[in-house]
Amino acid sequence: MVAIIRRSPVVFDVSPSREEKRDHWTVALEYPGEGEGPWITDLCHKTRWDVQDGDLLSLASETLPIPEDYGRVALSQEMSVNRMNRTQAAVWHFTENPGPMPNVAAFTETTEATVFLALYGPQVFAVTEKLTSLDLGGPDTEPPQLVQGPFSHVPCQIVVASKGDTPGILLTCSRGYARDMVHAILDAGREFGMRPAGEERFKQWCNQF
């Protein structure tokens, strides 16, 4: 019998102090010396779907709240549902067991095709300012909001999840950019003390949603 092994394309210079195996992924729960933030967390093991349909809102339900307006986001502790345009939305799950993808042609799983990162904590927008001309922390951005554009010169989907005392963003991009993206983020965040953090730190941040 062939064992299935799923590997995140994200690699940090430090190894996790606690980890677990889950659905053939090795999930980092905690890193040594996570500090006071800001943090970067690898979420590549989290289930992600792309949804495309000419009548997108017909697929909405209590468990899949697709926003009516483009650029808006339905954000909770369980998921982020991002309205991209008239016919397309992205679904990013945060839970360990989100359930099966609907058996409908409109849904495509993108988990292993993309990078999924969370950047959050104090000074996180000072870090992002060094990596993009998009004004993610500016007054015209009302969380939760989807922003699509270049981040470290890479096309990304970015959700500005929160500002205030617990600011942060979520972002996805093509899997092939993982190494360069992580290197650029940590390099930009070095002066602010940015460090890798595990899934448990991310869960604490998600409690505000």
Across the structure, where does each feature detected by a protein language model lie?
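Basic, glycine/lysine-rich polyanion-binding surfaces/domains
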Residues: M1-F209
